[in-house]
């Protein structure tokens, strides 16, 4: 609830900046305006992922989206649009930012960072053609390249720097409050061993994969710095999966092997004919379109799970691909993850203030 309210406060601030800087021609105004459009787009992307049901091509014009708030007006009570309207509005924010040709790193949100978020948005909304186009643009023209094995651990566990293939990341200054928070979180996350199903993905020789030593100690405890990052590895993985959904399995496999060669010492390229059969008992059994997982898609999911560990990705992968249900026992009680729980509830304060606002399924106040 607090995060939901905090995001809307940021949208409000962005709208104030946008309203007051539109039409100004100075470089400072353009840079600030591009940053405001970018931040607003990211806010809507996060609202879309967390407070809307996962994308469904057949229901995108019916499922509730996020209210469009285009101006600062404390008296307005906008209702939720559709999922498709939210996608289009969010993409519009990124396009508005790109139209200002942002290049000054002072404002953080430069062309390639904005395009990376736009690719994430298209990928989440199963717009495979757009996701492929943007990912290729970033890979071919941004100047970023996959960090090789030799530089991976330094890149992935850098304390402050966005080094190597990292386009942008959290915790980029040495604020004492942030230092304390990240130290606390790293300690907390190191108190539980990683899931055995994740460890098994590394096979019989896990040390050959540079990600293993960069992420785990001998007791399977996490040692990876828990940061939010936008990296070229994610762009490559999105490109691979987009190509898969577009029917270009050869291209999907080619990009997957490109990533593996930069992560696994002596990696042998995967071949379509010899990919392992789909495992039984995995959480994800269907893809984003509801189709059964195939050996190639399983291979893409496996590399993504290893690559994006501790970067806030796994929950959204589960939500995007079928919202699997499962249960655990804790202190003698059974806790079940239901499908509806993948979508967070709209803030009760907003519902009370605006009774016409539709609550997400499964939640009753």
Predicted regions and their residues:
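Short, cationic low-complexity segments
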Residues: 188-199
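Outer membrane beta-barrel transmembrane domains
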Residues: 183-185
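Acidic/polar-rich alpha-helix caps and helix-coil junctions
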Residues: 2-180, 202-365
């Amino acid at each position: 609830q607090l995060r939901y309210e905090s995001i809307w406060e940021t949208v409000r601030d962005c709208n104030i900046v946008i309203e007051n800087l539109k039409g100004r021609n100075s470089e400072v105004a353009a840079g600030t305006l591009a940053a405001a459009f970018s931040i607003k787009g990211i806010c809507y992307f996060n609202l879309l992922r967390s407070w809307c049901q996962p994308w469904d091509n057949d229901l995108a014009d019916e499922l509730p989206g996020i209210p469009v708030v285009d101006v600062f007006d404390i008296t307005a009570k906008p209702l939720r649009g559709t999922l498709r309207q939210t996608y289009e509005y969010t993409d519009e924010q990124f396009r508005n930012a790109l139209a200002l040709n942002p290049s000054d790193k002072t404002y953080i949100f430069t062309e390639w960072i904005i395009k990376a978020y736009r690719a994430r948005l298209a990928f989440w909304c199963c717009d495979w053609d757009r996701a492929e186009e943007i990912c290729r643009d970033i890979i071919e023209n941004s100047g970023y390249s996959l960090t090789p094995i030799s530089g991976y651990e330094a890149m992935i566990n850098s304390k402050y720097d966005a080094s190597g293939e990292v386009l942008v990341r959290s915790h980029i200054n040495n604020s004492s409050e942030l230092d304390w928070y990240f130290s606390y979180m790293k300690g907390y996350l190191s108190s539980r061993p990683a899931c055995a199903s994740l460890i098994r993905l590394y096979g019989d020789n896990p040390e050959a994969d540079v990600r293993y030593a960069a992420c785990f100690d001998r007791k399977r405890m996490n040692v990876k710095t828990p940061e939010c990052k936008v990296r070229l590895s994610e762009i490559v993985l999105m490109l691979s999966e987009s190509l898969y959904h577009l029917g270009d399995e050869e291209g999907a496999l080619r990009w997957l092997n490109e990533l593996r060669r930069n992560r696994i010492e002596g990696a042998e390229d995967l071949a379509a004919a010899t990919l392992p059969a789909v495992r039984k008992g995995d959480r994800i059994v269907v893809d984003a379109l509801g189709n059964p997982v195939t050996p190639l898609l399983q291979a893409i999911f496996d590399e993504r799970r290893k690559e994006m560990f501790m970067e806030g990705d796994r929950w959204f992968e589960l939500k995007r691909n079928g919202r699997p249900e499962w249960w655990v026992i804790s202190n003698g009680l059974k806790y079940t993850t239901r499908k509806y729980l993948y979508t967070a509830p709209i803030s009760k304060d907003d519902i009370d203030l605006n009774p016409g606002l539709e609550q997400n399924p499964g939640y009753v106040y």
